[in-house]
Design a protein with these regions (language model features):
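Class I S-adenosyl-L-methionine
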Residues: 1-108, 114, 214, 251-254, ...
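A contiguous loop/helix-start segment that scaffolds small-molecule binding in enzyme catalytic cores
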Residues: 5-7, 156-258
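A short acidic, often aromatic-flanked loop/helix-cap motif at beta-alpha or helix-coil junctions
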Residues: 56-61, 116, 140-142, 199-202
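Short, surface-exposed amphipathic charged segments that create phosphate/polyanion-binding patches used
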Residues: 65-71, 122-126, 147-151, 205-212
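A polyampholytic, Gly/Pro-enriched intrinsically disordered region
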Residues: 73-78, 126-137, 155-159, 211-220
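Class I SAM-dependent methyltransferase SAM-binding "motif I" and its flanking Rossmann-like core
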Residues: 85-157
Length: 258
């Protein structure tokens, strides 16, 4: 008899962002799998085994979790944010697609979480108030020229852009290159939001403009939102600014994009 595999989104940090469904799945699991820092956010429970691994070992982690489920173990695989956004849900599906036929019969559920772009947007107003897209700047699984083409297309089409994985120690140059690319298509005054570790003690939100956006404001714990030509900043005397993208696009702007 096989077990059950829950692919669980932990949200961006604080336990307040963990959904009730996710909390139940974590409590019911006999075995927990995930990137070490994410597992550290899950309270230890008696009788549960914990299997931390590196953030570049998603395929092996997914295969091991599926194997344990096939043996009758109740398993939870955790992801920060939402498991379906640059996270473990796709890795699990990839392994099911290429693995043993028996894995296709397993009870697998995907439990959503609050992804970083929504948590950051909520902190600052409504920068994703109109059409938007999400792009990962990591070139571990896709070539950098493809990332550049997607940035070009998104900026030219008038999307607000959420940038995941803006840089790391192994690739410190990529965020600067992405900003350089976006400057070809967007005004220098385009609002840019840096949201780091939302919901955690070291949370930091900063608002700047594309002209001055720099590497120093980002790391792997940062989510960057680049606004559109229509995105606006509301300065407030005793409160942090609000950033929003209007729901309506002026006809002249829409025709220029088309």
């Amino acid at each position: 008899m096989s077990g059950r595999l829950a692919v669980v989104g932990l949200g961006p940090g604080d336990e307040r962002y963990l959904t009730p469904e996710a909390a139940v799945a974590l409590a019911d699991a006999q075995a927990l799998y995930g990137y070490g820092p994410y597992l550290d956010r899950v309270p230890a429970r008696a009788g549960q085994s914990r299997h931390p691994s590196d953030n570049r070992e998603e395929a092996a982690r997914a295969a091991e979790a599926l194997g344990q489920t096939a043996q009758g173990v109740s398993v939870a695989v955790v992801s920060g944010g939402d498991p379906g956004v640059f996270a473990m849900a796709a890795a699990i599906c990839e392994q099911i697609a290429t693995g043993p036929d028996t894995w296709r019969t397993l009870d697998v559920v995907f439990i959503p979480g609050v992804t970083a772009m929504l948590a950051v947007a909520a902190r600052i107003g409504a920068p994703l108030g109109h059409d938007f897209c999400a792009v990962s700047l990591s070139d571990n699984l896709k070539p950098w020229p493809l990332i550049e083409r997607r940035l070009d297309a998104a900026a030219q089409a008038g999307f607000a852009i959420a940038l995941y994985n803006p840089l790391s120690r192994a690739r410190p140059w990529q965020f600067a290159r992405a900003v350089e690319r976006l400057r070809r298509h967007l005004p220098p005054t385009t609002p840019v939001i840096f949201g780091r570790a939302v919901g955690r003690p070291d949370e930091r939100i900063a608002v700047t403009v594309l002209e001055t956006a720099a590497n120093e404001a980002a790391d792997m714990a940062t989510l960057v939102i680049v606004g559109t030509r229509e995105t606006r900043v509301i300065e407030r005397p005793v409160r942090p600014p609000l950033v929003y993208t209007p729901r309506a696009i002026p006809r002249a702007v829409a025709e220029a994009i088309a």
